[in-house]
């Protein structure tokens, strides 16, 4: 058999330098691709002594083709994107290499040092065999209403995670998850792989993480890539434009780890009416979870009906605090499908759990409402909270408009517990429930320490007169 003829041409070689001053967010290098190219390889090399985070993205005449990042690396760092028909490297999207003007983008996420870089583009022309036909995608979830627990923040090796999509999905099943959102930074290259790991027992949601210079956000339930590069001061494409584009696809915009220091939320121009989801418990953020919970209450009191969720932010689904299954978002969905789960997230039929289960409803004026729903005034409000799988003595708090309303201490026990409360003086706003483990030795009366969190409900809203 005759070996394929391979011809490689250098289309671009650029040497440059980044430095802390002047502050530049993106560097753009255009190059021309001739007809007949079957594969393209774009490489960025730089040396990092302390902190120099550079990310590589490539855009063709038809749009976005991928992003590569390696934020933890030190020393000599190499980022590579390669693609062609039926072929793509990690972070890249497969497809024909179009002739015309292409663009390589260097995202200077942060740097406190001067660093030299080398950007090269290599065009390869060779005869490629026809791609093997693919079979139908597996069933993504199943019909039937229920309460489903899962993960809304996870990464694979297509961005800065360690695991493949198959390993991530396998871990989700092993640790009892029923749904999984893939939120790789910038890129959608893992979508086709994670969808192939779905089944009747595991629904997957196509998402990505906007990784900006002033904060991160998960874009959930997308049908196509949304441009997450919002830090060009000369561009009208900003964080609010991204949220509107996500909504135009029927997706949800969620703010991540808002108090994570330099990775926290600093888009002060953000219109909070565009926010659908907010991480109130992030498994890696530890004490910052208290600030996130307080900030969320501020949003709720301001009238923003934002759904509170949890995130593991898993980069290695079997290791340490990144291991899946240590914290869940539980959704009361019409079906275990992407559409059903997004519907539950949209209205706030959800709670955060680190193990136990809850059922939370309220009654007023002859009507009953669950989390995310609203009851009218006037009249007393009766609150019903069912708890199960309590393996610790717990303290249960009922919060009213973000402030303490009442609390109850319960012993450990395997039996289900039903708590019924009445508020004879309700006002417009909301109620939500919190459950914390009670340490055997504690000299603090309050009992809302972040490290003892077990359950956080979403609100039941109280409106004006019917």
Predicted regions and their residues:
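Solvent-exposed, flexible loop/coil segments flanking beta-strands in beta-rich domains
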Residues: 1-48, 121-129, 134-145
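Surface-exposed beta-strand/loop patches in noncatalytic accessory domains
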Residues: 7-22, 44-89
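Exposed aromatic-hydrophobic patches
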Residues: 28-31, 80-81, 91, 415-424
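Noncatalytic modules at the cell exterior or secretory-pathway interfaces
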Residues: 38-41, 93-114, 427-432
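Edge beta-strands of jelly-roll/beta-sandwich modules across compartments, strongly enriched
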Residues: 52-54, 112-124
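Charged catalytic cores and adjacent phosphate/nucleic-acid-binding surfaces used
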Residues: 57, 127, 131-143, 212-229, ...
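Histidine-centered catalytic micro-motifs
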Residues: 148-161, 312-314, 433
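Catalytic cores of extracellular degradative/oxidative enzymes
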Residues: 156-304, 321
